[in-house]
Amino acid sequence: MTTPLTLENIRRAPKALLHDHLDGGLRPSTVLELAEQYGYDDLPAHDADELAEFFRTAAHSGSLVRYLEPFAHTVGVMQNHDALHRVARECVEDLADDNVVYAEIRFAPELHIDGGLSLDAVVEAVLAGFADGEKAAAAAGRTITVRCLVTAMRHAARSREIAALAIRFRDQGVVGFDIAGAEAGYPPSRHLDAFEYMRSNNARFTIHAGEAFGLPSIHEAIAFCGADRLGHGVRIVDDIDMDAEGGPKLGRLAALLRDKRIPFEMCPSSNVQTGAVASIAEHPFDRLARLRFRVTVNTDNRLMSDTTMSLEMLRLVEAFGYGWSDLERFTINAMKSAFISFPERLAIIDEVIKPRYAVLVG
C-alpha cells in the first residue's frame, strides 16, 4: 500500500541537499545565545520567536538584495571558532532530523574573519563542526554525510584566493567552490581566474546564476566559466518558447543545458521570497522537470525562508501533484549531481535512497 504524501511521511523519506547556506540556517535561539555570549548588540529582536519572525518577514522582500540584508546578523555572530563549530554542528543535526542523508553546505569564509580568524581557521572550525554533527546524528540513529562548498562573494576580489582554499581542503571535506551574492553588475566572468584554477586542479564548482538576473548570467556561467552545476537557474525558462503546435521549443542555451545534464539547484520558497518567481505554483520547476531537465530540490536558507527539505517537497507536491516516484527522482537527481566520487554517490542511491523509497511506495 502506498504511503500517503503528508508532511509527516515526507519527513521519513531520505533526502539529498545540494544548495544550503550555513549562515542562512541558524536556529533563532542560537543566534540569540551567540549574540549574548560574544557581545553582538545589533539584533532586531531579543526573543527567539520574534527573531524568527523578523527573518521570515525580511525574506519576503521581493528583492534578492533586500533578502540578503538580514545575513549581517547571522554572520555577525559567526566570527570565532566556537561559534562556527556550533553552527556547523547544529546544521548537521537539524538536517539529519529531517532525514537528509547527504548534504553539501556552503559558506563564504571571507565573511567570518572579522574576529581575527584566518581563512584556514574558519574552514577548519566548520569542518570540525560538521564531523561532530555527523557523530551526534549517528548516535541518535540517523546517518548523514555532509560535505562543504566554499563560496566567494561575487562583489569582492578574493575568488582566486577562496578557490585555492577549496583545493587546500579538498581531502578534508571541501568538495567544491561557488560564487554568490547579488548578481546584477557582478557577472560570473569577473572571476574567470578562480574557475580556471579549479579546472586546472580537476575540481568541481557551481555558480549562482539566473536567480535575479537573466539568461546572460546563465550563459556566462556555462560557456565562459564551465560551471558543473547552476545555483537556481530559474531564468532558463526565458529560453523556452512554444512551437506552432503548442509544444515546447528550447532555445540553444536551454537545449545545451538539458543535453549536458547540467543540474539545477532549485530553491522554490526562496525564489518566491526574492521575487524571482511569483508563487510556487508559477515556479518553473515543474515545467523543467517535465521537460527532463536535471532539477533538484533545495532549501537555500532554512532560517530566512522558514523551511526544511520536507516542506520544500510538500509545497511542490501541493502545487504540482507529484507522487513518491517524482520525489525519488528529484532526490536521485541530486545524488547524481553531488561533488563526491561516483562510488560514494552510487552507494547512497542504491543502499539508502532506493530501499527507503521502496518502503514508502509500497
From Swiss-Prot:
SUPFAM superfamilies for this protein: Metallo-dependent hydrolases (SSF51556)
A Gene Ontology term for the protein's cellular component: cytosol
EC number(s) reported in the record: 3.5.4.4
Residue numbers binding substrate: H21, D23, G181
MF-aspect GO terms: 2'-deoxyadenosine deaminase activity; adenosine deaminase activity; zinc ion binding
Binding-site residues, Zn(2+): H19, H21, H208, D300
Cofactor details (free text): Binds 1 zinc ion per subunit.
Catalytic activity: adenosine + H2O + H(+) = inosine + NH4(+); 2'-deoxyadenosine + H2O + H(+) = 2'-deoxyinosine + NH4(+)
Any Gene Ontology biological process: hypoxanthine salvage
InterPro entries with a match to the protein in the record: A_deaminase, A_deaminase_dom, Ado/ade_deaminase, Metal_Hydrolase
Signal peptide: none
Entry cofactors: Zn(2+)
Record-marked site positions (Important for catalytic activity): H232
Superkingdom classification of source: Bacteria
Annotated active site: E211 (proton donor)
Keyword annotations: Hydrolase, Metal-binding, Nucleotide metabolism, Zinc
HAMAP family recorded: A_deaminase
Family: Belongs to the metallo-dependent hydrolases superfamily. Adenosine and AMP deaminases family. Adenosine deaminase subfamily.
Role according to the record: Catalyzes the hydrolytic deamination of adenosine and 2-deoxyadenosine.
Name of the protein: Adenosine deaminase
